[in-house]
Each structure stands twice: as structure tokens, then as C-alpha cells.
Amino acid sequence: GDVYKRQVSDTVRRNITIGLPRVLAFWDTMPFWTTFWRSLGFEIQISSPSTHKMFEEGLSAVTSDTVCFPAKLVHGHIRDLVKKKVDRIFMPSIAAIGSENTESTSESMCAVVKGYPLVIRNSDSPEKQWGIPFDAPLFYWYREEDKERQLITYMEQTFSIQPSETKKAVLA
């Protein structure tokens, strides 16, 4: 409770709202991402829970009939974030995540899930269509230090945020 509030209130407010789509494996890591962005002073907007209407609204952008339903639904979530007037949409491709069992093994994700942010960038093109930057960095997270190092680089290049601030946010 209090520790989290204090930490956020001490943070510089950036007046940038980051849209996070409530989709695919990205949803499983949402607690990390919401804490990460908020502790760096960003506002967060998560897309609404999935509905059939949301699915239908995104269908025009679906490039393949054979792609799975959860992937098709992503297009509707992107449109939902556009309606919520976010400043940027963040949907990383995370190529590998460390296994909970041992340090030496990694579990790989479904290729569609892994590559879907690139599909969104090309088919929906949020920047071109709605003027909303669509950030889809590719992360290779085999070990905890990969996560920290790659996020430090991404935040420094994208938002000019100091490595020490990003490091604190990763651990928040």
C-alpha cells in the first residue's frame, strides 16, 4: 500500500499515457508492465475486456483468416486504445521468458504470439492511421539481467530516461 504510493508520488509525472493491449501472453505480464511504467511517471491505460463487438471492430485489419481467434482479437484491442486517446501503444515481442524451474532452460512462446506486434504495426499501422506511436520492441529475455539491460536501452533511446531510473522501475 503505502510504499507503492510513496514511490509513485516521488516520481516525475511525464504526462504521457501508455496504452497496453489486454491480449495474448502480454496479459500474463501485465502486473510487471503496469508497475514498470507507473514507477517511471507514465499514466497507464489498459484496453477494455474482450467483447464480440471489439472483435468485429478489428476484423477489417486481420490479414489472415487462418490466424487464431486470440490473435484476431488484438486488432480490436488496438482500436479500443485509440478510442481511449492514449499517447502511445506499447506491445513488445518477447522472444523468450525464463523458466520458473531452472536457470538454464528457457521456454519459447508460440510464433504467432511472438510476432504479432509486427503484424499490428504493418496491418493496423497506428502511427499512420491515428498518429499514435506503436512501440513493439523485440526483447530476448533468457535471464533476468537481459530484461534489465534491454529495458534500460529501450527507455533511454525512446524516452531519454536515465539507466538508474529504469533499473529502479524494473525492480519495483
Walk through the language-model features, giving the residues of each:
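Short, small-residue-biased leader/transition segments that mark boundaries at the very start
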Residues: 3-4
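A short, charged/proline- and glycine-enriched loop
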Residues: 8-18
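Short glycine-rich or small-residue beta-strand-to-loop segments that form or flank ligand, phosphate
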Residues: 16-22, 61, 91-92
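Short, glycine-/Ser/Thr-/acidic-enriched flexible segments
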Residues: 23-26, 51, 94-96, 139-141
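Short acidic, glycine/serine/threonine-rich loops at helix termini
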Residues: 30-32, 56-61, 99-108, 145-154
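Short connector loops at secondary-structure junctions
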Residues: 42-66, 137-144
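N-terminal glycine-rich phosphate/adenylate-binding segment common to multiple enzyme folds
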Residues: 62, 68-139
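Cap/lid and interdomain-hinge subdomains that line or gate substrate/regulatory clefts
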Residues: 114-172
